[in-house]
């Protein structure tokens, strides 16, 4: 037979392994080891019957009566302590209703679905397969075919008494506790219908019409003191009243509390002179509800709610008779309550005062239980949302609170010692329960005449019929605080494929692969394997809400394509860190290490930067070779400019230089225009407009893909593209759903190299990354290392200029890109070059060294006074209202530099018109990245407004004559100006480009 995946540890796993090794008719023998009967009989081991596997051959008791010896009985007094759902516990409870049966009661299936929704899918499949159920049959609710492939026309199902006993097990879990209690309340509140005694030849139509007529009219008040006027169903000890929470409880919590006649509650105020006799509790008291487990199909007791003369059939365990006699309960024996029922008489008096009931949550009283039920459901019964972090059991009243808590990466918030008091009490109670050696209290269920069988005296009463537990009756029902209801989650969600879902046990080869009743989630779900199961709440599954949010997200993305929370697009970039995030840069270096000669063109599939691989550091996104090839092909079409960026070999820190034979042969006029475009619009703009190629880096044919058609196609493809994994979707709604399912829990690492801080949102990460005060140490180290790294993007243009034209100083290009420059300030702050050009360099570029004294200190990012009315053409896309830009002194000294018109002795000039023309040639939708704050803007106008309002007025020039150092704050400028040691180098000769 086929092998199934090994189940996980625990008692349930051991049972599953045993059932895999044996056929169905022998699986029960393995499970029966050390499973003794809980009734007072000598049976020590369950032995399944040959015909009915749920009946023991030795004692004729049912499977549930034996299996309950291995299950913990929850206490019946009000408590908010619940257990954590575990796979082995769910297996034990599932065996009560699934082992040896072919159909599941509806109420139990609803509750079991809740528990399965907490487990992983493979755990659910293991439980079902171990009990010889398939997922299709479980979803359907009954087995369609037997082991031989025959279509069933009758099914074996657990009896109603066994169902009640199983329902009690669901009180142990917060996911199902409230549902079980509400089921009990609903059943107990069924309106009684007074029907005259039926005759043998009564007409069915007349009977139904009579019932309808009587139920439609207002019934006369029922005399609660007359036992004959009470609905017979309420008199059955086997109903669900045991699951109602009671305030008065026995120190020894009973396992099954029956519904007592209401006159008991009315008489509990009277003095009873008789002393109760000592109660006798066995390991599991006798009960007749477990004696009918051999019935092949038990009629649900709910079918008899409107038929008082038809009570659930009971069969004797000693002989499987076919008796069809039904008993009508018309009389009760008056018995006295135990002393425990007299606890807190002031609370008890509320139940007798005009029939008023009170709510235990807010202590308010109500006219009747119906009003109390409406109040409790509307005020106190709220569906709680559990934290999605595995191992954290915090629950919240709203999705917003839950999501905010789950998105917090602080592990202390999700550790057990910081959970709420309810969970602390739960752990304490579990530890206490495991340490105590207590015996399972029994279920108290009597025969239809409300008297226990002679051979099995019920533990609920002593020999005189006195109740062994307190009961405050119908009017005194108390409601606990139901705080642990979890939203229903589909336990059959993918990661399993439809073939795996349809995988059936070896003994059921004839079942269909997939039934039509299985939801589409089994087929269309695209969620990957994840250690943390994705949980969606009931609210988020509403189509209207999703559609509304999708429209809002789509509109927001159209108007704010590059908001603070978006990843900057690396098309117009200033350095390699801009072209590729630090994470992707490191990944690409590890995956694409060059082993060939220096200056070798990058082979296909080994581009120095893949936008597809720009991922967050915490996201474990890996690419298969096929995906990598596909991504590299897409990069050839979409980002041809990025292939121009060379990268150094990882090992040894050696540098690549262009060989003499591979120097670019570019006409000087074209070179000058290319340089201007590099200064004004970036590398991508220059190449896309000129179509020039550097033979040392890539063949010129690669650049033929760059054009308006390619740009339009790129923009169209990127319209609905995920900013993190770069996958393209058909619409904005698909992008939103993909981002929520795939990336909502990813952490975002700081983009500053050397800083490993992580944040739950891109907006927080960008705010942190733009604060240079937090990165002075990392930036100082990076600035020192940059002098040895010639192939950082900061020095790419300078090196290209030196190799192409040794006699032309590429001063402006090297400085206008505003990248990390050699040198730091006294405080170790990051410095940027500021350029000036003599009036003679308006039309041509004069050769001259770069002044190391001309630096810009951006050590702080606080707001500045408006001392500057100019900015570089590269920074502002070549447009400035004042017509001034930051230039560099052509003769190398530090005199006469100013950002304010009129202060400089040299005319202010730059390639304003040409830069503006180059920017005008850019596509309108092409994003632009600000080189100072790393924010991305959707178009030139937005970026221009940002630069004017944020960065243009933040530059403060040193007050010392001849020092052109610029600062982003007055405080830093004053501190620099007052330090005479920093201005001794004004007389030193400037250094030349190396």
Curated annotation (Swiss-Prot):
Positions carrying Phosphoserine: 537, 541
UniProt record, GO biological process: cell differentiation; epidermis development; positive regulation of cell population proliferation; positive regulation of oocyte maturation; positive regulation of transcription by RNA polymerase I; regulation of transcription by RNA polymerase I; spermatogenesis
Comp. bias intervals (Acidic residues): 563-578
Annotated segments matching region Hydrophobic: 240-249
Compositional bias annotation for Basic and acidic residues: 603-614
C2H2-type zinc finger locations on the chain: 357-380, 385-414, 720-743, 748-775, 928-951, 956-983
Entry comment describing in which tissues the protein is expressed: In epidermis, primarily detected in cells of the basal or immediately suprabasal layers (at protein level). In hair follicles, mainly expressed in the outer root sheath (at protein level). Expressed in epidermis, testis and foreskin, and to a lower extent in thymus, spleen, mammary glands, placenta, brain and heart. Expressed in the ovary, notably in oocytes.
Composition skew (Low complexity), residue ranges: 859-877
UniProt entry tagged with the keyword Repeat: yes
One MF term in the entry's GO annotations: rDNA binding
GO cellular component: cytoplasm; nucleolus; nucleoplasm; nucleus
Region (Disordered): 1-29, 402-425, 444-472, 555-639, 859-881, 970-994
Outcome of swapping residue 537 to D: Reduces phosphorylation and induces partial relocation into the cytoplasm
Classification via InterPro entries: Disconnected-like, Znf_C2H2_sf, Znf_C2H2_type
Biased composition (Polar residues): 615-630
PTM statement from Swiss-Prot or TrEMBL: Phosphorylation on Ser-537 and Ser-541 leads to cytoplasmic localization.
Pfam family, one: zf-C2H2
Function: Transcriptional activator. It is likely involved in the regulation of keratinocytes terminal differentiation in squamous epithelia and hair follicles. Required for the maintenance of spermatogenesis. It is involved in the positive regulation of oocyte maturation, probably acting through the control of BMP15 levels and regulation of AKT signaling cascade. May also play a role in the early development of embryos.
Protein name as annotated: Zinc finger protein basonuclin-1
Species of the source: Homo sapiens (Human)
Source lineage: Eukaryota, Metazoa, Chordata, Craniata, Vertebrata
Gene: BNC1
């Amino acid at each position: 037979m086929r092998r199934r995946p090994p189940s996980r540890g625990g008692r349930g796993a051991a049972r599953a392994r045993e059932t895999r090794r044996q056929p169905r008719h022998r699986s029960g023998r393995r499970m029966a080891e050390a499973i003794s009967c809980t009734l007072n009989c000598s049976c020590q081991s369950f032995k399944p019957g040959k015909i009915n596997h749920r009946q023991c051959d030795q004692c004729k008791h049912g499977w549930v009566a034996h299996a309950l010896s291995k299950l913990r009985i929850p206490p019946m007094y009000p408590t908010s302590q619940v257990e954590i759902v575990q796979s082995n516990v769910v297996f034990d409870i599932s065996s009560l209703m699934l082992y040896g049966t072919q159909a599941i009661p509806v109420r139990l299936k609803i509750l079991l679905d809740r528990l399965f929704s907490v487990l992983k899918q493979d755990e659910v499949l293991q439980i079902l397969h171990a009990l010889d159920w398939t997922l299709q049959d479980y979803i359907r609710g009954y087995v369609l075919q037997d082991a031989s492939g025959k279509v069933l026309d009758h099914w074996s199902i657990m009896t109603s008494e066994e169902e009640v006993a199983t329902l009690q097990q669901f009180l142990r879990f917060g996911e199902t506790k409230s549902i079980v209690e509400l089921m009990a309340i609903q059943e107990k509140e069924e309106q009684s219908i007074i029907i005259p005694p039926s005759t043998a030849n009564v007409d069915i139509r007349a009977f139904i019409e009579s019932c309808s007529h009587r139920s439609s009219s207002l019934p006369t008040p029922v005399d609660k003191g007359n036992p004959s006027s009470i609905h017979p169903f309420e008199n059955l000890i086997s109903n669900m009243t045991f699951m109602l929470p009671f305030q008065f409880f026995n120190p020894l919590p009973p396992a099954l509390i029956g519904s007592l006649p209401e006159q008991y509650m009315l008489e509990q105020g009277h003095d009873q002179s008789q002393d109760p006799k000592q109660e006798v509790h066995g390991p599991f008291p006798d009960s007749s509800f477990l004696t009918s487990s051999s019935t092949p199909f038990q009629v649900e007791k709910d079918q008899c709610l409107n038929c008082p003369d038809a009570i659930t059939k009971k069969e004797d365990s000693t002989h499987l008779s076919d008796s069809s006699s039904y008993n009508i309960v018309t009389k009760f024996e008056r018995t006295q309550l135990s002393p425990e029922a007299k606890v807190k008489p002031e609370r008890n008096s509320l139940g007798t005062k005009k029939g008023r009931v009170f709510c235990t949550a807010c202590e308010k009283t109500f006219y009747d239980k119906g009003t109390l039920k409406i109040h409790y459901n509307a005020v106190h019964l709220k569906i709680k949302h559990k934290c999605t972090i595995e191992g954290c059991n915090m629950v919240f009243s709203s999705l917003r609170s839950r999501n905010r808590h789950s998105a917090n990466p602080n592990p202390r918030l999700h550790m057990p010692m910081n959970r709420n008091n309810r969970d602390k009490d739960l752990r304490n109670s579990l530890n206490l329960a495991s340490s105590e050696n207590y015996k399972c209290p029994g279920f108290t269920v009597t025969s239809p005449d409300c008297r226990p069988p002679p051979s099995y005296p019920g533990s609920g009463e002593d020999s005189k019929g006195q109740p062994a537990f307190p009961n405050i009756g119908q009017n005194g029902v108390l409601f606990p605080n139901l705080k642990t209801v979890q939203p229903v989650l589909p336990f059959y969600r993918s990661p399993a494929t439809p073939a795996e879902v349809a995988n059936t046990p070896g003994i059921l080869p004839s079942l269909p692969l997939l039934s039509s009743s299985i939801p589409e989630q089994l087929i269309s779900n695209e969620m990957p394997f994840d250690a943390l199961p994705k949980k969606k709440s009931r609210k988020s599954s509403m189509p209207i809400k999703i559609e509304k949010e999708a429209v809002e997200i789509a509109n927001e993305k159209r108007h704010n394509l590059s908001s603070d929370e978006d990843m900057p697009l690396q098309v117009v970039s200033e350095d390699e860190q801009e072209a590729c995030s630090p994470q992707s840069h490191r990944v690409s270096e590890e995956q694409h290490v060059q082993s060939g000669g220096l200056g070798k063109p990058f082979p296909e599939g080994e581009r120095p930067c893949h936008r597809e691989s720009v991922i967050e550091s915490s996201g474990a996104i890996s690419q298969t070779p096929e995906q990598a090839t596909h991504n590299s092909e897409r990069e050839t079409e979409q980002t041809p400019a990025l292939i121009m960026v060379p990268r150094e070999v990882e090992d040894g820190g050696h540098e690549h230089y262009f060989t003499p034979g591979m120097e670019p042969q570019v006409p000087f006029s074209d070179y000058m225009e290319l340089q201007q475009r590099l200064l004004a619009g970036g590398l991508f703009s220059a190449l896309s407009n000129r179509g020039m190629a550097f033979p040392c880096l890539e063949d010129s044919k690669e650049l033929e893909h760059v054009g308006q058609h390619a740009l339009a196609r790129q923009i169209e493809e990127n319209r609905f593209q995920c900013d993190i994994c770069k996958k393209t979707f058909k619409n904005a709604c698909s992008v939103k759903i993909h981002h929520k399912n795939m990336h909502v829990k990813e952490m975002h690492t700081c983009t500053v190299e050397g800083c490993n801080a992580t944040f739950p949102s891109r907006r927080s990460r960008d705010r942190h990354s733009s604060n240079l005060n937090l990165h002075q140490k990392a930036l100082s180290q990076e600035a020192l290392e940059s002098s040895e790294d010639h192939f950082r993007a900061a020095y790419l243009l300078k090196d290209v200029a030196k190799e192409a034209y040794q006699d032309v100083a590429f001063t402006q290009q090297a400085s206008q890109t505003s990248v990390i420059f050699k040198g730091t300030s006294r405080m170790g702050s990051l410095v940027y070059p500021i350029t000036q050009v003599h009036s003679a360099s308006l039309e041509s570029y004069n050769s001259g060294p770069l002044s190391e004294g001309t630096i810009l200190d951006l050590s702080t990012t606080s707001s500045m006074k408006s001392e500057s009315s100019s900015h570089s053409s590269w920074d502002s896309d070549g447009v400035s209202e004042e017509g001034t830009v930051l230039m560099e002194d052509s003769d190398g000294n530090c005199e006469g530099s100013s950002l304010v018109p009129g202060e400089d002795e040299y005319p202010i000039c730059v390639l304003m018109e040409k830069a503006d023309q180059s920017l005008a040639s850019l596509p309108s939708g092409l994003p632009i990245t600000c080189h100072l704050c790393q924010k991305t803007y959707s178009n030139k106008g937005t970026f221009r407004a940002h630069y004017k309002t944020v960065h243009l007025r933040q530059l403060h020039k040193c007050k010392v004559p001849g020092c052109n150092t610029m600062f982003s704050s007055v405080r830093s400028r004053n501190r620099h100006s007052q330090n005479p040691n920093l201005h001794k180098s004004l007389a030193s000769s400037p250094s030349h480009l190396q």
